[in-house]
């Protein structure tokens, strides 16, 4: 069975207060002066003090084996802050640190270890505040207002490096080869790891490690590094340093799912919802010039305009990609929303998903069998539901203690205001009619004979995504739905968590003393007119799921308060994030893909045209991480997701899966 939680570090603290691994019988850092050793071995061994001011790019990428207590990272972060303060006009503006950890510390142990270095406290406290729960895969932490990015990959480094997306190939400027001593942890120090380090290192990339073991030096030389010995720190006689003097072009591992970025840094985003807003922030943080074109007179008038939306992960025991995306997207979303410097109505009150019938009970039982961390999800028995949620349902279920609700409309509006303060240009009442290539740019034709030219375009306009010739064949569909707004009652006012059943019910929003109950589902419809049938059905589904609950029968929808919206969805429930694929060229180039995979060319796409769509009903959960994924791709930066999950987000995936099996593909 696949496990979705990671085993935490098994450690104790010795007489000096130094953490020691019980499993590896080794210290996490030197008893003498771990901080100075880090500065000498890793910062000095990679010559970072000299390289930072001379770096010709805005981003410096460092990768590390073994995050441990984060001492190396915190020391580096402090040094980077000092560099930026001393060289504010330098080309280098941002730091990206990638680290792998098989047995992450608990937050409590991390905080205890950090007490050793009071001079690192300002940085350590920020790390502790965002420390992720023990889920496998990549956890992206945005620190110092996005100037420092930390990618924590939880799992075995030798397994994870084989699962990385090609976006990391030849991107690493410096390697910190750390971890428990080779004699204590031989399973990590393998030729497989050394080869992966070489693959990820950019030309001129360096490495440093505390060990001088001969097999390590020979293995790194075999991988392609030029190695040399250097005086070790303190009582250690020698350590190793290396450089990747030259690299060869690397073939794409799965060219049919290849992701291409852009060398340009000027973009038009089409849309006005949460996808557009969050992508704008992610691109602005990377130095892009961003313009946004919204068809409406104001933002969040489409699917992002609801008063309350639930935030919790979409999990399925039988869908690996779904679990990888939504479990890590959920934790990223919580960190992201918590540090946003804008106001929006929200309450992280928890979400309880109830088993109201045999089918839903079976689904919940399968989710609970996935060995999920308790911070993510826990079982709740029927007799405990009332205590947790505040209302009686006579149903058992699964609780997401870090879930809750937020106001999507307010979030979208205020994020766009924040983005405007950072340079975003917004054009309202610009309905895009079509777009075409002109002189290596995109010519945008809007209703009313308005035109604009942009280097790069992102289509993030929800269910209208398929209205252009470049996207008309995409396998997406519209879903119209109505959310009912109901006044609170004394019984409903007791509701403490979001309830999910064959619908959902939110606790009251203190701003308006109303709850949201929804939502109707009409696949293939774009009708946004109020429906009395939908209003009554929203109420009836609640009553049908909890027939013994008197409070459910007292729900009042008679005032006809509701909001109707249209979502964009796919049949596999995953967003479409990446290059807009060229349908006709895909069919031609991949006509014999099943027999000629070794000869496949890179996925046919429209140059400098991207899409961010099909968020379905879980956009509040997936949008923050997907915005980060797309912005990283467009900027040719490391992506915070493994290759197979990125393939599951590729807009061409449904076509390619059929072509790989030798099956015919139809448009739409």
Curated annotation (Swiss-Prot):
Gene Ontology CC terms, in alphabetical order: cytoplasm
Gene Ontology biological-process annotations: methylation; tRNA wobble uridine modification
Pfam families: DAO (PF01266), Methyltransf_30 (PF05430)
Cellular localization per UniProt: Cytoplasm
EC numbers for this chain: 2.1.1.61, 1.5.-.-
Region described as FAD-dependent cmnm(5)s(2)U34 oxidoreductase: spans on this chain: 270-668
Residues in coiled coil: none
Region spans: tRNA (mnm(5)s(2)U34)-methyltransferase: 1-245
Gene3D superfamilies xref list: D-Amino Acid Oxidase, subunit A, domain 2 (3.30.9.10), FAD/NAD(P)-binding domain (3.50.50.60), Vaccinia Virus protein VP39 (3.40.50.150)
Signal peptide limits: none
Alphabetically ordered keywords of this record: Cytoplasm, FAD, Flavoprotein, Methyltransferase, Multifunctional enzyme, Oxidoreductase, S-adenosyl-L-methionine, Transferase, tRNA processing
Cofactor requirement: FAD
Superkingdom as given in the UniProt entry: Bacteria
Catalytic activities: 5-aminomethyl-2-thiouridine(34) in tRNA + S-adenosyl-L-methionine = 5-methylaminomethyl-2-thiouridine(34) in tRNA + S-adenosyl-L-homocysteine + H(+)
InterPro entries, sorted: FAD-dep_OxRdtase, FAD/NAD-bd_sf, MnmC-like_methylTransf, SAM-dependent_MTases_sf, tRNA_MAMT_biosynth_bifunc_MnmC, tRNA_MNMC2, tRNA_S-uridine_synth_MnmC_C
GO molecular function, one term: tRNA (5-methylaminomethyl-2-thiouridylate)(34)-methyltransferase activity
Annotated family: In the N-terminal section; belongs to the methyltransferase superfamily. tRNA (mnm(5)s(2)U34)-methyltransferase family. In the C-terminal section; belongs to the DAO family.
UniProt function note: Catalyzes the last two steps in the biosynthesis of 5-methylaminomethyl-2-thiouridine (mnm(5)s(2)U) at the wobble position (U34) in tRNA. Catalyzes the FAD-dependent demodification of cmnm(5)s(2)U34 to nm(5)s(2)U34, followed by the transfer of a methyl group from S-adenosyl-L-methionine to nm(5)s(2)U34, to form mnm(5)s(2)U34.
PANTHER family named in the record: SARCOSINE DEHYDROGENASE-RELATED, TRNA 5-METHYLAMINOMETHYL-2-THIOURIDINE BIOSYNTHESIS BIFUNCTIONAL PROTEIN MNMC
HAMAP family: MnmC (MF_01102)
Protein name stated in the entry: tRNA 5-methylaminomethyl-2-thiouridine biosynthesis bifunctional protein MnmC
The species this protein was found in: Shigella flexneri serotype 5b (strain 8401)
């Amino acid at each position: 069975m696949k496990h979705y939680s990671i085993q935490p570090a098994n450690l104790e603290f010795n007489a000096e207060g130094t953490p020691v691994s019980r499993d590896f019988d080794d210290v996490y850092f030197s008893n003498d002066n771990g901080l100075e050793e880090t500065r000498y071995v890793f910062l000095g061994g990679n010559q970072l003090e000299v390289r930072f001011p001379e770096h010709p790019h805005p981003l410096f990428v460092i990768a590390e084996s073994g995050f441990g207590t984060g001492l190396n990272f915190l020391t580096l972060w402090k040094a980077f802050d000092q560099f930026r303060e001393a060289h504010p006009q330098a080309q280098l503006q941002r730091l990206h640190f990638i680290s792998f950890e098989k047995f992450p510390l608990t937050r409590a142990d991390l905080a205890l270890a950090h007490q050793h270095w009071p001079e690192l406290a300002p940085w350590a406290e920020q790390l502790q505040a965002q420390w992720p729960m023990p889920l496998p895969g990549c956890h992206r932490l945005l620190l110092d207002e996005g100037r420092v990015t930390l990618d924590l990959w939880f799992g075995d480094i030798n397994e994870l490096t084989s699962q990385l997306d090609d976006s990391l190939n030849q991107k690493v400027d410096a390697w910190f080869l750390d971890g428990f001593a080779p004699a204590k942890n031989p399973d990590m120090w393998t030729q497989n790891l050394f080869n992966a380090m070489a693959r990820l290192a950019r030309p001129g990339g360096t490495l440093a490690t505390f060990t001088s073991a001969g097999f390590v030096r020979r293995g790194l030389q075999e991988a392609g590094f030029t190695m040399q010995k250097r005086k070790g720190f303190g009582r250690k006689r020698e350590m190793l340093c290396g450089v990747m003097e030259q690299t060869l072009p690397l073939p794409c591992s799965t060219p049919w799912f290849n992701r291409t970025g852009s060398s340009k840094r000027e973009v038009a985003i089409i849309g006005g919802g949460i996808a557009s807003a969050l992508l704008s922030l992610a691109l602005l943080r990377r130095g892009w010039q961003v313009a946004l074109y919204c068809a409406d007179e104001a933002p969040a008038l489409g699917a992002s305009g609801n008063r309350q939306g639930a935030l919790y992960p979409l999990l399925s025991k039988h869908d690996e990609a779904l679990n990888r995306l939504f479990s890590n997207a959920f934790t990223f979303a919580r960190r992201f929303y918590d540090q946003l410097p804008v106001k929006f109505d929200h309450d992280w009150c928890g979400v309880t998903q109830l088993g109201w019938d045999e089918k839903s009970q079976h689904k919940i039982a399968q989710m609970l069998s996935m060995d999920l961390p308790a911070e993510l999800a826990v079982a709740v028995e029927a007799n405990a539901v009332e205590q947790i949620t505040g209302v009686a349902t006579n149903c058992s279920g699964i609780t997401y203690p870090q879930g809750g609700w937020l106001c999507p409309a307010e979030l979208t509006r205020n994020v766009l205001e924040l983005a405007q303060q950072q340079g975003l240009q917004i054009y309202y009442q610009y309905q895009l009619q079509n777009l075409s290539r002109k002189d290596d740019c995109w010519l945008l034709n809007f209703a009313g004979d308005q035109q604009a030219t942009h280097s790069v375009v992102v289509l993030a306009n929800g269910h209208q995504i398929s209205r252009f010739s470049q996207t008309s064949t995409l396998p997406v569909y519209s879903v119209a739905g109505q959310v009912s707004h109901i006044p609170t009652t004394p019984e409903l006012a007791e509701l403490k968590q979001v309830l999910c059943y064959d619908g959902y019910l939110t606790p009251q929003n203190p701003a308006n003393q109303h709850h949201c109950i929804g939502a109707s589902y009409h696949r293939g419809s774009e009708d946004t007119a109020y429906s009395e049938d939908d209003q009554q059905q929203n109420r009836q589904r609640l009553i049908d799921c909890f027939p013994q609950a008197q409070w459910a029968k007292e729900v009042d929808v008679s005032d006809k308060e509701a909001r109707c919206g249209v979502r964009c969805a796919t049949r596999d429930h995953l967003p479409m994030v990446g290059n807009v694929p060229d349908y006709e060229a895909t069919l031609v180039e991949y006509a014999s893909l099943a027999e000629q995979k070794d000869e496949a060319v890179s996925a046919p796409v429209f140059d400098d045209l991207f899409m961010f769509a099909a968020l379905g009903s879980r956009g509040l959960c997936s949008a923050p991480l997907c915005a980060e994924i797309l912005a990283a791709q467009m900027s040719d930066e490391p992506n915070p997701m493994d290759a197979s999950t990125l393939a599951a987000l590729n807009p061409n995936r449904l076509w390619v899966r059929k072509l790989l099996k030798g099956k015919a593909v139809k448009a739409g």
